[in-house]
Amino acid sequence: SSLEERRAARAARRRKQDENEGGEEQEETTSRRSRRRQQEDEEDSYSAPAEPAYDAEAENRRRQQQEEEEAAARAAEEEYNRQQEELRRQRQEEERQRREEEQRRQQEEEERLRLEREEQEREEEARRMAEEQKKKKKKGLGGLSPEKKKMLKKLIMQKAAEDLANEAKAKAEAKEKYINDLVPKFSTDGKDVAALQALCKDFHKRLASLEEDVYDWEAKIRKQDFEINELTLKVNDTKGKFVKPVLRKVNKTESKLDKIQRKEAKKSDFRDNLKSSREHEADKEGGEGENE
C-alpha cells in the first residue's frame, strides 16, 4: 500500500542520512532524530485510517479511467473495422463495375467482329456471283470449262517450274565449271614450308587480280548507270514533261513466275554477276569491232 511505501522511503532516507553524518554529529542528533521519528510515526498512525478511503477513491478513478480508455479503444477499433469494411465494399463495387465494363466492351467487340465478318461474307458472295456471271457470259480458252481451264493452268505452272529448275541447275553447273576452271585443284601433301608459302603468294596474287577486276567492273557499271540517268533526264527535258508509263494488267501466272525467278536470283553470288559482266563486255567489244 501507499503507507508502507512512504514508510520504506522514510527508512531509506534515514539510513542514507545516518551514513552521511559523522561520529560526533551522530551522538548530538540522536535524541533529536528519535523525537522526529516518534512524531512522524504518530502522524502516520493518525493519518492511517483516512488512507483507505483515499486509496478506494483513487482505485475507482483509475478503474473508471481504464474503462473509459477501453471504451475509447473499442470505439476506435469499431471505427477502424467499419472503415475497412467500407473500403472492402468499395473495392468490391469497383471490381464489379470493372468486370461489367470489360464484359460490355468484349460483347461490343464480338458484335463488331461478327458484323464485319458478315459484311465480308456478303461481299465475297457478291464477288463470287459476279465472277460466275462473267464466266457464263464469255467462254475462256476456246470454250473450256472452269475445271479444264484450271487443270491447264496447273499444267502450265508445273512446266514453267520445271523449266526454271532446269535453268537454275544449268546455271549452277556452269558456275561450278567456271570456278573449277579458274581455280585449279591443288594439294598440300608432301610440300615443305617454302612451297606452301609460294602457293599462298600465288593465291594472294590471284585474289588481288580478281579484286582489281571487280573494282574495274563496278566502276564501269556505275559509269554506265550515270550515263543512262543523264540520257533519261535529257529525253525528259526534250519532251518537256515526264511521260507516264503505260500500265498493264499483270497476270497472276506472270506474277508467280516473277516471284520464282526472284527467289532463284537471290541464290546467285557476285561471281555469277562477274561472269555475266565479262560476257557482256566481250559481246560489246565484239560489236564495236564489227562496227569498225
Swiss-Prot record:
PTM N-acetylserine: list the residues. S1
Q: Which stretches does the entry tag as region Disordered? A: 1-149, 255-292
One short Pfam family name for this protein?
Troponin
Taxonomic superkingdom: Eukaryota
- A GO biological process this protein is involved in? muscle contraction
Q: Which GO terms describe its molecular function?
A: actin binding
UniProt KW keywords? Acetylation, Actin-binding, Muscle protein
Q: Name one GO cellular component term.
A: troponin complex
Q: Where along the chain is composition biased (Low complexity)? A: 46-55
- Region labeled Actin-binding — which residues? 237-250
For bias type Basic and acidic residues, the affected ranges are: 58-134
Which family, according to UniProt? Belongs to the troponin I family.
Function as written in the Swiss-Prot or TrEMBL entry: Troponin I is the inhibitory subunit of troponin, the thin filament regulatory complex which confers calcium-sensitivity to striated muscle actomyosin ATPase activity.
Q: What is this protein called?
A: Troponin I
Q: Which organism is it from?
A: Chlamys nipponensis akazara
